[in-house]
């Protein structure tokens, strides 16, 4: 058979590593990353999770908690008490003398809350399960955290799902707020046992928390989460507001009277973009504080009675001061750079709001920590200064319908005059997301693929079509009830715009993407003959069957307006499988075996349709993987297959 339906074994995955990454892994060894930054209250020390890419591509980088002087970048302390742990979100005590962080140990199944000070670290609480987001009480004598006791899977819909055996839907993981005294001890679970808490913020007097939460399955119900208050004494939950759109980052004002949050149409928890809304702590209707803002807020904090926010504005990341009464705003700092994994809100601020720290990177420059008094942020780390640029980049803008659309064009460093080049179009996930600058380096997931493509002579186009972040709520919600419509036209118009300014051969185009990008790839090959090859990762072929198969069906209601049972026509109209007879493009399909968000059944259905049409197709299902591949071997194999597929059908 010319088509392959392959279930990869661990041995085959390991063997596949030699194809692409033997040289690439060596080239990227030593690149340092900085994540989950936390600036202390005084603004003179910064903690971060730091890791160095290992020379062996089959191994995952292990991060340590590193404390640096925020002026010089000098390392003051390094903490790594658990060799198998994934740490998250270091948090400074109010007096700045201690640092708390969580370690989740995949080997033992334990979660530990660690306390570090004066160069020493100890676990002050341990339990079976997973945890994240430790935060100090205002008095510095207690710590709160989000705990899932006896968790069946890692938290989040992008993680591999729990085995679906036995009676389904009767035993859900619930993430709850828990308290631990500074001196240590067992968890005290506070929030209701039938409710999944996504985010929280301490009340200024330590009496409780504002939360975003939903009853039942946490993976599925974030899209209908409400804003609430949990009492630290009784654990009682009181709903403050139930907005019709999604909400992130609840933050309580210093006087305890107002809650601010980021709200808007969002397709994935953790992918944040919207306007700033406020609501009284007593409850009431949320008010959009920033209507008409031509960007997407993605971070939020109160400082001295005003809001400090981060936002994506077109191709730039910015820090803004926002008046909590009028909504007036001024840009304090902006740069064409990416900060997406730097910290929970992208930028961390000192207690008085005058100083900040974040980790910046661009397509051409590796990450580095910048810190200082706003707006003058200066580099304090130089570990990656010697790493070279692997691509050339330009921001591309074009108009389609009533919108101005932005994207990125990456190209080989050396382009010969008079020569034309193939181009890969990579559609981001989401749809509520956006491509922001990130260092292109060998061996790093999508960025590693971009490196390998440009090294082979490809141009790479990364469009941000309607539905993406960066241009306000009107733009990010313009794909409602129109997936595969205006967004697809934006992408095609973007390709046309690129071909007017770059030496791209229209007869050597490839289309690819993962998640929403996988759906758009399936849509593209059933609605266009323009592409010579396609790679659809974790795509959606049939929205009707998908509605009943996935573990997050609540996300579709905001986009389609109704359930698939109430309005099947709009779901059918957006389904690539409805046009499968038009599909002629050779397509590689990849998906994780335990993908909760886009189950492998969708990929199998599309593979089956292409096979029936006689279209060249290959399907690879990666064992044990979820929506976001975690194993380096899986990522390397997917990348190797992608390059081989394009070499076969495009070059």
Regions found by a protein language model. Give the residues of each.
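Conserved beta-strand position repeated across blades of beta-propeller domains
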Residues: 38, 91, 135, 201, ...
């Amino acid at each position: 058979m010319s088509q392959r339906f392959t279930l990869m074994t661990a041995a085959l995955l390991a063997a596949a590593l030699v194809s692409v990454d033997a040289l690439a892994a060596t080239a990227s060894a030593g690149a340092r990353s900085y994540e989950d930054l936390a600036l202390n209250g005084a603004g003179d020390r910064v903690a971060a999770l730091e890791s160095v890419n290992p020379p062996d591509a089959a191994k995952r980088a292990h991060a340590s908690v590193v404390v640096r002087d925020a002026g010089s970048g000098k390392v003051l302390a390094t903490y790594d008490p658990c060799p198998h742990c994934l740490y998250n979100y270091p948090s400074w005590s109010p007096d700045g003398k201690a640092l708390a962080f969580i370690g989740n140990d995949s080997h033992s199944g334990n979660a530990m809350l660690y306390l570090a000070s004066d160069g020493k670290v100890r676990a002050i609480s341990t339990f079976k399960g997973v945890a994240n987001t430790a935060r100090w009480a205002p008095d510095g004598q207690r710590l709160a955290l989000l705990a899932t006791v006896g968790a069946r899977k890692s938290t989040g819909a992008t993680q591999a799902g729990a085995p679906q055996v036995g009676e389904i839907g009767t035993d859900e993981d619930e993430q709850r707020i828990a308290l631990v005294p500074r001196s240590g001890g067992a968890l005290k679970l506070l929030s209701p046992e039938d409710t999944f808490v996504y985010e929280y913020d301490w009340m200024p007097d330590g009496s409780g928390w504002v939360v975003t939460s939903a009853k039942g399955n946490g993976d599925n119900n974030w899209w209908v989460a409400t804003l609430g208050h949990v009492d630290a004494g009784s654990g009682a939950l009181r709903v403050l507001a139930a907005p019709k759109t999604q909400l992130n980052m609840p933050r309580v004002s210093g006087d305890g009277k107002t809650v601010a949050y980021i709200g808007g149409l969002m397709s994935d928890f953790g992918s944040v973009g919207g306007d700033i809304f406020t609501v009284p702590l007593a409850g009431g209707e949320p008010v959009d504080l920033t209507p008409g803002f031509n960007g997407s807020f993605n971070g939020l904090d109160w400082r001295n009675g005003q809001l400090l926010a981060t936002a994506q504005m077109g191709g730039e990341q910015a820090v803004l001061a926002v008046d909590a009464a009028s909504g007036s705003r001024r840009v304090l700092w902006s740069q064409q750079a990416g900060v997406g994994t730097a910290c929970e809100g992208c930028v961390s601020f000192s207690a008085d709001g005058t100083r900040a720290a974040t980790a910046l990177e661009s397509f051409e420059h590796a990450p580095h920590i910048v810190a200082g008094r706003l707006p003058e942020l200066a580099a304090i780390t130089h570990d990656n200064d010697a790493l070279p640029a692997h691509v050339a980049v330009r921001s591309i803008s074009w108009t389609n319908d009533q919108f101005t659309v932005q994207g990125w064009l990456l190209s080989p460093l050396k382009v010969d005059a008079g020569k034309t080049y193939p181009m890969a179009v990579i559609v981001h996930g989401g749809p509520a997301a956006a491509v922001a600058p990130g260092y292109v380096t060998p061996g790093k997931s999508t960025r590693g693929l971009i490196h390998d493509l440009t090294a082979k002579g490809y141009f790479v186009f990364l469009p941000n079509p309607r539905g993406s972040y960066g241009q306000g709520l009107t733009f990010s919600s313009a794909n409602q009830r129109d997936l595969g419509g205006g967004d697809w036209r934006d992408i095609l118009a973007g390709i046309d715009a690129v071909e007017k300014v770059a030496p791209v051969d229209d007869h050597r185009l490839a289309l690819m993407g993962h998640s929403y990008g996988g759906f758009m790839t399936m849509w593209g090959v059933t609605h266009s003959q323009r592409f010579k090859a396609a790679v659809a990762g974790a795509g959606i072929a049939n929205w009707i069957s998908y509605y009943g198969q996935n573990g997050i069906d609540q996300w579709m209601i905001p986009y389609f307006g109704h359930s698939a049972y109430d309005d099947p026509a709009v779901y059918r109209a957006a389904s690539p499988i409805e046009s499968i007879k038009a599909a002629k493009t050779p397509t590689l399909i990849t998906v994780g075996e335990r993908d909760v968000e886009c189950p492998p059944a969708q990929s199998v259905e599309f593979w089956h349709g292409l096979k029936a049409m006689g279209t060249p197709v290959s399907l690879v299902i990666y064992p044990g993987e979820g929506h976001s591949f975690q194993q380096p071997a899986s990522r390397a194999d997917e990348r190797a297959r992608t390059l081989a597929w394009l070499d076969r059908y495009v070059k």
